[in-house]
Curated annotation (Swiss-Prot):
The gene is tlcA. Its main location: membrane. Belongs to the ADP/ATP translocase tlc family. SUPFAM superfamilies: MFS general substrate transporter. It is found in: Cell membrane. It comes from Rickettsia typhi (strain ATCC VR-144 / Wilmington). The keyword Chaperone does not apply. This is ADP,ATP carrier protein 1. Residues 55-67, 114-147, 206-218, 301-320, 370-379, 460-465 are extracellular.
Length: 498
């Protein structure tokens, strides 16, 4: 009897630690490996792209890249994807897009990166044009280092195309609903484990003691890893199509039904929906406020990171460390987030994100505005300079804001849709995706880039007081929006219960 109980206990423990059935490993493990490779590239690209742009062009250029290059490129990429869907089958689309990224990584690694003087315009010409046209100097500087700008854009598109679109489309196609409940939680843990691995890889290859290649080509091994990873993604995808999608135990094509088209609204229709429904408007305001406030702090923080770590290698190593902490904090929030939601009210759970942003943002900006006071009173005690402390608090703010997003912010936002009637829920969510998604991601960059165009003599140092003021105004509006949405939410919940 005791043996039977012990076996049952071990069986239950195994289901908690590894909820995948033995026969499902053939499907889950290659899918998980694909996701790991995609995320290894994703987190490596995120660390490197800023290192090139910030140190060679300037931190201010990031807002211009996001607004005027990345956003249009994402739209063009989606148009091309839709066209490919009309002429190729899904498997071949995956090969075409992944091969495009692989080809670009090879081109950048062996041509654009090693020979910048051959591909970039003359530095003196760019400087003279920047002085002649100060309002457009950041556009001119971006053109002057166009290969780094293209790398930044491709890095941004990798996350959108490879992870959000191709991987999840494939996973959703071949994963049954009963499997998804167990598979997807494990994917979440795996996704965040790729971040610490990236940190270790970057730290090793860019360390000054690692002498695999010449000093001016330190990034080559990282590019080779990304190229290899891209090859492995293609090979794994091919193997799954040959061995998993042909196994009736793991995939039944008759169960793949045509899904009803999601409600799609135009930009104008989305605006009308948000302005005519106070409830939907509040949800949109939450998403916009999150995106804009994160971008405003992130821009200032990266300018301070550049001051502390002025070289490409040092900056990239630091961003790798940032990914390390972000990965573990995200895992921690994933584990505790569901418990928080079960034990507190919707209002309390929804308030955690803006209050955390306000407190950490206030600490970050305090170390910038009062650096001389801190230097006199705290530097000796804390054995750190005001700049180091500002960078540290900026990292804490960014790590927490991204960690809390996936566990609490997204969960409370999605809960807010539940009490709505079906028509408003479907159309409202579509409207929020169009307006909130676009303005949230690009809103902060638009504010910053417009500011630098109107005031060309300003950099982040001079503009920080203005960006800080906008940040606090937006977070306060966010808090009021949460309170307003909670009132509407409680009315609908009580109405539905009665």
């Amino acid at each position: 009897m005791s043996t039977s109980k012990s076996e049952n206990y071990l069986s239950e423990l195994r289901k908690i630690i590894w909820p995948i059935e033995q026969h499902e490993n053939k499907k889950f493990l290659p899918l998980a490996f694909m996701m790991f490779c995609i995320l290894l590239n994703y987190s490596t690209l995120r660390s490197i792209k800023d290192g090139f742009v910030v140190t060679d062009i300037g931190t201010e250029s990031i807002s211009f890249l996001k607004t005027y290059i990345v956003l249009p490129s994402a739209v063009i990429a989606m148009v091309i994807y839709v066209k490919l869907c009309d002429i190729l089958k899904q498997e071949n689309i995956f090969y075409v897009i992944t091969s495009f990224f692989l080809g670009y990584f090879a081109l950048f690694a062996f041509v654009l990166y090693p020979y910048p003087d051959l591909v970039h315009p003359d530095h003196k010409t760019i400087e003279s044009l920047s002085l002649a046209y100060p309002n457009f100097k950041w556009f001119i500087k971006i053109v002057g280092k166009w290969s780094f700008a293209s790398f930044y854009t491709i890095a941004e598109l990798w996350g959108t195309m490879m992870l959000s679109l191709l991987f999840w489309q494939f996973a959703n196609q071949i994963t049954k609903i009963t499997e998804a409940k167990r598979f997807y939680s494990m994917f979440g843990l795996l996704a965040n484990l790729a971040l610490p691995v990236t940190s270790v890889v970057i730290g090793y290859f860019l360390h000054e003691k690692t002498q695999i290649v010449s000093e001016h080509l330190k990034f080559i091994p990282l590019f080779v890893i990304m190229i290899t990873s891209s090859f492995l993604i293609i090979l794994t995808y091919r193997w799954m199509n040959k061995n998993v999608l042909t196994d009736p135990r793991l995939y039944d094509p008759t169960l793949v039904k045509e899904k009803k088209a999601k409600a799609k609204l135009s930009f104008i229709e989305s605006f009308k929906m948000i302005f005519t429904s106070k409830y939907v408007g509040y949800i949109a305001l939450l998403i916009i406020a999150y995106g804009v406030s994160v971008n405003l702090v992130e821009g200032v923080w990266k300018s301070k990171v550049k001051e502390l770590y002025p070289t490409k290698e040092a900056y990239t190593i630091y961003m790798g460390q940032f990914q390390f902490y972000q990965g573990w904090v995200a895992i921690a929030f994933m584990l505790i987030g569901s418990n928080i939601l079960r034990k507190v009210s919707w209002l309390t759970a929804a308030m955690i994100t803006p209050l955390m942003m306000f407190i950490t943002g206030a600490a970050f900006f305090s170390f910038i505005f009062f650096d001389s006071v801190i230097a006199m009173n705290l530097t000796g005690i804390l054995a750190s300079s005001p700049l180091t402390l500002a960078v540290m608090f900026g990292m804490i703010q960014n790590v927490l804001s991204k960690g809390v997003k996936y566990s609490l912010f997204d969960a409370t936002k999605n809960m807010a849709y539940i009490p709505l009637d079906k028509d408003l829920r479907v159309k409202g969510q579509a409207a929020v995706e169009v307006i909130g998604g676009r303005l949230g991601k690009s809103g902060g960059a638009i504010i910053q880039s417009t500011f630098f165009i109107l005031f060309p003599a300003f950099g982040f140092i001079e503009a920080t007081p203005y960006f800080a003021s906008i940040f606090f105004i937006i977070v306060i509006l966010w808090i009021f929006a949460v309170k307003g949405l909670n009132k509407e939410y409680q009315v609908l919940v009580n109405k539905n219960e009665n």
